[in-house]
Amino acid sequence: MDLQNQMKKAVAQAAVDQIQNGMILGLGSGSTAALMIEALAIKIKSGEIKDVVGVTTSFQGEVLASELGIPLKSLSSVSEIDLAIDGADEVDPKFQLIKGGGACHVQEKLVAALAKKFIVVVDSTKLVEKLNLDFKLPVEVLPSAWKQVQKTLINLGGEGNLRMAQKKAGPIVTDQGNLILDLTFRNGIDQPELLETQINNIPGVLENGLFVNLTDEVLVGKVESDVVGVESLKKI
């Protein structure tokens, strides 16, 4: 196992260690979240964790959790989530995030917003000084509106194109049946709070991948002298 995967596994386990009996859990998407789901399933099977139920943020996560025997509920059936755990594509010093590399950010944001506590699990490569310098910002749009939205986003300084599928012809289609525009802002994103609102106010936009003022704790996998460890970053 390479060092990056070791870091992912370490933070996934550290997040699962915070789960208590009887919790309603938000189970995130992506490679690190998948490791977290697997670690949770092991603890449930051993009896170390009892009476928990998960709310998944993607169809992929739902399939994995179901196969591993984790009890699930739909998002619409819960009024509150005790703890949500998810990965991120970028994390800035103020705990603002870009998510949506897996095109699941709409459900991910709904789950994070409903959680009493939202933990983000990442390896150290995901920590950045400024968002969007290296990772594009995904914006989910109605299929009939993508051209109109694309033109409007140019006025906000964002240049973007449809995310295309790798193993089929045509664009990526989200779990909600929409399309993704991946945006780049020339100098990165200076004001995530403002930009999140501006983008979501554009007709035809369902949601964007900026997660603003949602994160309570970031668990970071780090390597020092070839030893993998986990650092907990919390808001002051």
UniProtKB/Swiss-Prot annotation:
Which terms under GO biological process does the entry name?
D-ribose metabolic process; pentose-phosphate shunt, non-oxidative branch
Q: Which reaction does it catalyse?
A: aldehydo-D-ribose 5-phosphate = D-ribulose 5-phosphate
- What SUPFAM superfamilies does this protein's entry cite? D-ribose-5-phosphate isomerase (RpiA), lid domain, NagB/RpiA/CoA transferase-like
State the active site.
108 (proton acceptor)
**One Pfam family per UniProt:** Rib_5-P_isom_A
The family annotation for this protein states: Belongs to the ribose 5-phosphate isomerase family.
Write the protein's name: Ribose-5-phosphate isomerase A
- In the record, what lineage is assigned to the organism producing the protein? Bacteria, Bacillati, Cyanobacteriota, Cyanophyceae, Synechococcales
The record's gene field reads rpiA
